[in-house]
Amino acid sequence: MKKYLKRQLGPKLVQWARQYPVVMLTGPRQSGKTTLVKSLFPKHAYVNLENPVERDYATVDPVAFLGQLGRRVVIDEIQRAPTLLSHIQSMVDEAPDEHGHFILTGSQNLQLMRGVSQSLAGRTAIGSLLPFSISEIGGGGNLWKTLWQGFFPRIFHDNLDPTEALSFYTATYLERDVRELVKVRDLSRFLQFLRLCAGRTGQLLNAANLAADCGIAGKTALEWISILEASYIVRRLPPWFANVSKRLSKTPKMYFLDTGLVCYLLGISSADQLASHPLRGAIFETFVMTEFWKHYANRGMADKIWHYRDGGQREIDLVNEGSAGRMLVEIKSGQTPHAEWGETLKRISAVFPDAPQLYVVYGGTSDQIRGGVRFVPWRSIDSLFV
């Protein structure tokens, strides 16, 4: 029997179901949404709109479809029948004090949020479930093997070959999500664009450069990046800015939300190949960045995360404002800590009006403090939030 790994978002979803009539859970395909809501709400009826029979019923006769499901229901992949949202609104309006009525999941954030804002604003709690965090899988094993296989639950639960599993994942994503979100005649061109983006994870976003390399218009490149964001493939990290300087970069950085997917798209076929790959530093940085996003998403909280880059090309990988105050974080994939890694942090910290905490997250195993900078091993990222 497979061991089910508990998800950190679970308690928050249960809390929301006691407070709101509708709970919406978004996130990428195969991040574990269905498994989670089924385990948390076993007494709810369940229907999956990926099933063409159910989807046709929901589209043709939504009133009858909802009527036969009862007052407690989980509807999976709700974006496949978006007209249901207005009918769900009517049912919620009939019993506004009934909480946990509908548990909805979806993997296309753009359409879902548009539908919720139009039909269910104020009635819905919204959370995002990303693939496993490092703490959810118990800290991981070898660094490069962990990053190479990525964090999608099925790869862990079923011991799947990452390259094979992620090739199927990509094909499904292109056929189901991309075709639905945009009129792309040539999916091979979009796949080329996706691979080009993978090679730029952790870099400043340059849509014009991407467009030129892919042979598409700049406007198309921006549209496709928005599609990748809406379907939880990538995320943009905004720049930190303040009135203290007009010379700060205003360009976001782009990160993939799973390192295994990056490795697959780049043709990295083993952990050993990743360990010596020229983009291993960017992939490690991608891992750390997604861990921060997962920390906040798993607690139902909005994150306050930026990158810093000034006119002198000085950079800080991550600026985070949390309950413990502001922290500045450098990210290094090396396994042996070096004091100079913290020097940029100390120089730039003077820009900030308070006294931020300084950290280097690195690829080693020893937690130590050097010259006022704490060096945090990759397995211990969660300790930054304690």
Please report, for each region that a protein language model flagged, where it lies by residue:
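N-terminal pre-Walker A segment at the start of P-loop NTPase domains
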Residues: 1-14
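Conserved lysine of the Walker
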Residues: 33
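Hydrophobic positions on the alpha1 helix immediately C-terminal to the Walker A/P-loop
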Residues: 36
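Structural recognition of the conserved hydrophobic beta-strand(s) that form the central parallel beta-sheet
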Residues: 74, 101-107, 128
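Conserved catalytic/switch belt of AAA+ P-loop NTPases
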Residues: 85-104, 118
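Short regulatory helix/loop adjacent to the ATP-binding pocket of P-loop NTPases
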Residues: 110-125, 141
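Accessory nucleic acid-recognition modules appended to NTPase machines
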Residues: 160, 164-326
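Domain-level recognition of nuclease-like catalytic cores that cleave nucleotide substrates
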Residues: 364-386
